[in-house]
């Protein structure tokens, strides 16, 4: 198969210009000296672009997804060919290749560890890779304001024959260097024993995600102002009385007259000394060591505050203030933009959501861009989601995978061991969260234990599930409590979390489970029985680790009760899913990474691990918990969700698919949730069902033996509270608050 290297030059990035107008396209064939270049004033440019995206050859580029989107915008009739070529696996991106090479050798995608113990940030720009592989410094050409890169828009409408020599040299150098890096990556892969499997798959996913970025989401000015007001009210000193009384929050200082002028006022600020003093007191109450920073100061980071906030009302307020403050610090500024029209910063009518297609977990991430108003679409505060609304005449079609990571875990165990309780529960038409919740309730709730005496856990599941639709609020509350507890238990323990980390995880979103509160409500009989059981040895280990005290000094403090409950929950989880012990043993024995070595603070070697994803990507340099999470949960789910994103985007944009979704526009990808903007018409139900079918079809690529469901819903604005709503004919209709 021939290989073509291609690149484009465009107008500059900016608001409304995520994939700007195409100016010129340049290309070369592998091993040939000739480099072609055509401007948008050349009548042959369309035919050349058509040849570049035609089937039958490998197409390679640096951030090739940008080039393909630019070409599709310039020549819409080429869009079907682009999608077909991507699905055929004939397009690859140097960035995806480089990341997979790093993932399969060191496992590090962000920072490389140097021999002296320091770290170096890993770059994926053409300039970064040219310097790494070729010793070629391209930084001036890429970064200088006067570089030809920034002025191709001035050549709009011209034939390439009329381009200045600097612009010709710049464009041709880019495509030549692309070839040189590509060949160097191949050599490095062979020399290092690496792998770039799934480069084409991730390139296809990257194109779909970039199409979503280009669309962006419209903002609602009224909702934005409501959010700003909510933040200001929440941060008002009147709402922070405990913080003020503790001296942690200094009040604002108003400007005052001084020497004929006015002093500069000061906003409310945090008194670090008072904060640290409260943290120390709370740590003593919680009976945990005070964590210190490298500089010897008391640590008051989010993890520490999470662990001790329950012991100090002022720290609870501080935690709430930090959460709201994050909206003020990140969400609100990212929604604003200076359009350089003399009106200053203001709410942008459209916010874009850029994506990083491949991170170390093999999942995706999202981040803001400096080039246009943008935000991290995968970590939007729920209180800010309502600012994003569908365009006039459109609605949001949301859909997420139901219990995605439990499905992938079931498939992984079934593939490895030929059996999986998760799979059995799903095939029986039951819900794993409710299934585990029933087992937890049988262990910890005496009345439920009595009412299910002699039952199988299947029957106990059915009884608990029936309470969801009970006419009695107490039954509904009971169902919600135990299914809610099962979520962090069933999703946290497969990742190998210890009890302390699990307790902190359970307390956070999306679970919000107060394990400490539940532990303190349990009767003394539970703890008497626990002390006589097999888990007491583990609890004594944590007692000594956290307090430094001997076994003889053990006392049932709230902290020890909480850890005991966490250990008990994990024990019940193991009893319901016994293959998980085999899963952990498999990781310890079959997933050892013999190529990479890590050391702890004392210089002792730490065993690292590796694994292969369902589609064949290799990930090395992992901790045990990274493999436990990645092998069974994160990587399979990520690959299936990326495949779904590609299929949905293609049907929305490729007219040859003949899909009811054609003309719709996906705008958001949030790991297991995909939000698409669709016209508000009589086919909304059909579009929703088709989207759900595509998501199920995509996940079958990685989970062929465990079925999954995708649950679509319609809403006018993004909301965490939205639910599927059906009319009398059982057709999906628009949910409203």
What are these language model-derived features?
Residues 2-31, 43, 252-476, 582-673, ...:
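Acidic, glycine-rich two-metal-ion catalytic cores of nucleic acid-processing enzymes
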Residues 6, 10, 19, 185-189, ...:
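Catalytic phosphate/metal-binding cores of nucleic-acid and nucleotide-processing enzymes, i.e., regions
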Residues 20-23, 31-189, 430-468:
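Active-site-proximal helix-loop-helix substrate-binding element of RNase H-like nuclease domains
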Residues 57-65, 269, 400, 501-504, ...:
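Short glycine-rich phosphate-binding loop at a beta-alpha junction
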Residues 81-94, 116, 139-257, 413-427, ...:
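Mixed-charge, glycine-rich, non-catalytic linkers/tails in nucleic-acid processing enzymes
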Residues 100-108, 211-236, 409, 489-494, ...:
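Catalytic palm subdomain of template-directed nucleic-acid polymerases
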Residues 170-187, 191-219, 232-233, 271-285, ...:
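Core structural elements
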Residues 179, 230-259, 269, 567-581, ...:
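Polymerase palm active-site segment centered on the conserved acidic dipeptide of motif C
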């Amino acid at each position: 198969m021939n290989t073509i290297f291609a690149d484009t030059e465009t107008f500059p990035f900016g608001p409304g210009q995520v994939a700007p107008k195409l100016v010129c396209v340049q290309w070369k064939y592998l091993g040939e000296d000739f480099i072609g270049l055509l401007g948008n004033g050349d009548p042959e440019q369309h035919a050349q672009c058509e040849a570049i995206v035609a089937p039958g050859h490998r197409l390679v580029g640096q951030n090739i997804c940008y080039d393909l989107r630019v070409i599709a915008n310039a020549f819409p009739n080429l869009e079907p060919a682009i999608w077909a070529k991507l699905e055929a696996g004939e397009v690859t991106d140097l960035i995806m290749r480089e990341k997979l090479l790093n993932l399969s050798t060191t496992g590090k995608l962000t920072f490389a560890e140097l021999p002296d113990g320091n770290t170096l940030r890993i770059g994926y720009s053409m300039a970064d890779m040219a310097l790494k592989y070729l010793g070629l410094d391209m930084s001036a050409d890429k970064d200088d304001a006067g570089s030809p890169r920034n002025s191709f828009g001035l050549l709009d409408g011209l034939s390439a024959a009329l381009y200045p020599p600097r612009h010709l040299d710049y464009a041709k150098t880019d495509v030549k260097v692309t070839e040189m890096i590509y060949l160097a990556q191949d050599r490095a892969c062979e020399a290092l024993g690496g792998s770039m499997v799934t480069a084409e798959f991730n390139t296809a996913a990257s194109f779909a995600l970039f199409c979503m970025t280009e669309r962006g989401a419209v903002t609602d000015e009224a909702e934005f102002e409501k959010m700003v007001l909510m933040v200001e009210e929440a941060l008002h000193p009147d709402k922070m009385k405990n913080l003020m009384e503790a001296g942690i929050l200094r009040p604002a200082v108003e400007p005052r007259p001084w020497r004929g002028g006015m002093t500069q006022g000061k906003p409310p600020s945090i008194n670090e000394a008072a904060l640290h003093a409260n943290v120390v007191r709370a740590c003593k109450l919680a009976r945990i060591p005070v964590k210190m920073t490298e500089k010897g100061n008391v640590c008051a980071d989010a993890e520490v505050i999470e662990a001790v906030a329950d012991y100090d009302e002022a720290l609870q307020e501080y935690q709430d203030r930090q959460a709201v403050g994050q909206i003020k610090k990140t969400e609100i500024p990212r929604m604003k933009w200076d359009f350089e029209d003399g009106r200053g910063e203001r709410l942008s009518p459209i916010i874009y959501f850029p994506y990083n297609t491949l991170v170390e977990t093999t999942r995706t991430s999202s981040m803001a861009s400096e080039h246009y108003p943008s935000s991290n679409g995968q970590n939007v505060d729920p209180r800010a989601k309502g600012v994003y609304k569908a365009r006039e005449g459109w609605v949001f079609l949301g859909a997420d995978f139901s219990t995605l990571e439990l499905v992938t875990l079931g498939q992984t165990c079934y593939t490895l061991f030929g059996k999986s309780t998760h799979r059995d529960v799903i095939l029986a038409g039951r819900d794993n969260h409710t299934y585990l919740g029933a087992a937890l309730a049988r262990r910890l709730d005496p009345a439920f234990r009595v009412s299910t005496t002699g039952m199988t856990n299947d029957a106990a599941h059915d009884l608990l599930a029936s309470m969801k639709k009970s006419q009695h609020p107490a039954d509904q509350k009971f169902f919600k409590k135990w299914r809610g507890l099962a979520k962090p238990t069933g999703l946290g323990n497969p990742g190998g979390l210890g009890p302390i980390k699990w307790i902190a995880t359970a307390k956070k979103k999306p679970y919000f489970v107060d394990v400490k509160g539940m532990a303190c409500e349990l009767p003394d009989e539970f703890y008497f029985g626990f002390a006589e059981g097999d888990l007491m040895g583990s609890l004594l280990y944590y007692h000594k680790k956290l307090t430094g005290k001997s076994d003889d000094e053990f006392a049932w403090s709230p902290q020890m009760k909480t850890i005991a409950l966490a250990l008990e929950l994990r024990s019940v989880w193991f009893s319901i899913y016994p293959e998980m012990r085999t899963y952990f043993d498999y990781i310890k024995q079959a997933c050892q990474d013999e190529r990479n070595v890590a050391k702890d603070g004392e210089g002792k070697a730490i065993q690292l691990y590796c694994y292969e994803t369902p589609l064949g990507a290799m990930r090395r340099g992992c901790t045990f918990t990274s493999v436990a999470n990645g092998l069974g949960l994160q990587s399979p789910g990520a690959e299936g969700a990326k495949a779904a994103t590609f299929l949905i985007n293609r049907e929305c944009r490729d007219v040859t698919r003949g899909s009811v979704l054609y003309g719709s526009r996906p705008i958001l990808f949030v790991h297991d949730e995909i939000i698409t903007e669709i016209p508000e018409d009589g086919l909304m139900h059909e579009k929703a069902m088709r989207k759900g079918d595509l998501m199920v079809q995509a996940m079958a690529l990685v989970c062929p033996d465990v079925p999954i469901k995708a649950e679509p819903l319609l809403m006018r604005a993004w909301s965490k509270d939205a639910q599927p709503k059906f009319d009398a004919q059982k057709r999906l209709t628009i949910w409203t608050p």
